[in-house]
Swiss-Prot record:
Keywords: Cytoplasm, Flavoprotein, FMN, Isomerase, Isoprene biosynthesis, Magnesium, Metal-binding, NADP. This is Isopentenyl-diphosphate delta-isomerase. Substrate binds at residues 6-7, 152. Pfam families: FMN_dh. Its cofactor is FMN; NADPH; Mg(2+). The keyword Iron-sulfur does not apply. The keyword Magnesium applies. Involved in the biosynthesis of isoprenoids. Catalyzes the 1,3-allylic rearrangement of the homoallylic substrate isopentenyl (IPP) to its allylic isomer, dimethylallyl diphosphate (DMAPP). The gene is fni. Its EC number is 5.3.3.2. One of its GO terms (molecular function) is magnesium ion binding.
């Protein structure tokens, strides 16, 4: 019951705290093309994460599950949206269902609603190989997300305090997994050093989960008597984290998440090197406040606007969008300069 109550608390506080930090995309400017030589009608938005082919560079990221009927209903509606738009979708952490079989229905519902969809299972980095296999089987997943949430755990009153051996546990899962493994942050971003460590153990897809979206330090602080307020602004902004990650020059697929709300955010993230983008808090807020059909309509608009932007930039595919010229400025530029990452090549492509 404690875990289920926490799941419901997370939904409540995620909606009430909102996106309290900046994602950094205001520091990214496209170089305008007056002669784009492009047509809206010829644009395609297919992309890939590793060997997984996706019809859109937008997918529904992990949000919830394991909190009884309310989380079942949320996942049921999200799966309906995913089916309508043919989007990939991740479920929230499945540890609740591994501990209590009665909670498995709140995850299994996604496959029931969308039998042919692309779904990602989800567990924390404390998971064992056996737990990872069970999570994948539970929803017949196409991939497995392993989330890294050190700051959330430290801020969580009942959270973990020991993070030794995490990389070794992930490596064991990678070696045994029958589906691709995606490692993701939960709103605090990934550094180039972290990305390199993950690449070294065979990870081929990473969700950088940057600062700018749902602030899980703030969410957990709402549940504490004594707030750890020093964690509320902790992390690497999403735009910065994408550049850090891609600077490692590994042959990896990158997912950009963390405050993504608009088609312009999507376009900038892809132009910085992401293969796809993931929405969570923004979609959840629309679903809970305005209803499922409004979320369906919003995703329609996102795709329309993304195609408008691609037309303006003179590109026809997501791969071409990854090579358009842009300028990195402001705080993002200064951070990257201090980290020894040259951004000039973006503006000279």
């Amino acid at each position: 019951m404690v875990r289920a109550k926490r799941k419901l608390d997370h939904i409540e506080y995620a909606l009430s705290t909102g996106q309290s930090r900046t994602h950094g995309f205001h520091d990214i400017d496209f170089v305008h093309q007056s002669l784009p030589n492009s047509s809206y009608d010829t644009i395609t938005c297919e992309t890939k994460i590793g060997e997984l082919s996706l019809s859109s560079p937008i997918f529904i990221n992990a949000m919830t599950g394991g909190g009884g009927e309310q989380t079942l209903h949320i996942n049921e509606q999200l799966a309906y949206v995913a089916k309508h738009h043919n989007l990939a979708m991740a479920v929230g952490s499945q540890m609740a269902a591994l501990k209590d079989e009665s909670e498995s229905a709140s995850y299994k519902v996604v496959r029931k609603v969308n039998p042919n969809g692309i779904f990602f299972a989800n567990l924390g980095s404390e998971a064992t190989v056996e737990q990872a296999e069970r999570a994948v089987d539970m929803i017949e997943a196409n991939a497995l997300q392993i989330h890294l949430n050190v700051i959330q755990e430290l801020t969580m009153p009942e959270g973990d305090r020991d993070f030794t051996g995490v990389l070794q546990r992930i490596e064991k899962i990678v070696l045994k997994s029958k589906v691709p493994v995606i490692v993701k942050e939960v709103g605090f971003g990934m550094s180039k050093e972290t990305v390199q460590q993950l690449a070294n153990i065979g990870i081929t897809a990473i969700d950088i989960g940057g600062q700018g979206g749902t602030n899980f330090a703030a969410v957990e602080n709402e549940r504490r008597q004594r707030m750890l307020s020093y964690f509320n602004n902790w992390g690497i902004q999403t735009a910065t984290s994408i550049i850090e990650a891609t600077s490692t020059n590994n042959n990896l697929s990158f997912i950009a998440s963390g405050g993504i709300q608009t088609a312009l955010d999507v376009a900038k993230a892809i132009a910085l090197g992401a293969n796809t983008t993931a929405f969570a808090g923004y979609f959840l807020r629309i679903l809970m406040q305005d209803g499922v059909e409004n979320l369906v309509d919003e995703i329609d608009l996102l795709h329309t606007d993304l195609k408008f932007i691609m037309t303006a930039l003179g590109v026809k595919t997501i791969e071409e969008l990854q090579s358009v010229p842009l300028v990195v400025k402001g705080e993002t530029y200064h951070w990257l300069a201090q980290r020894g990452i040259d951004t000039a090549h973006y503006s000279r492509r």
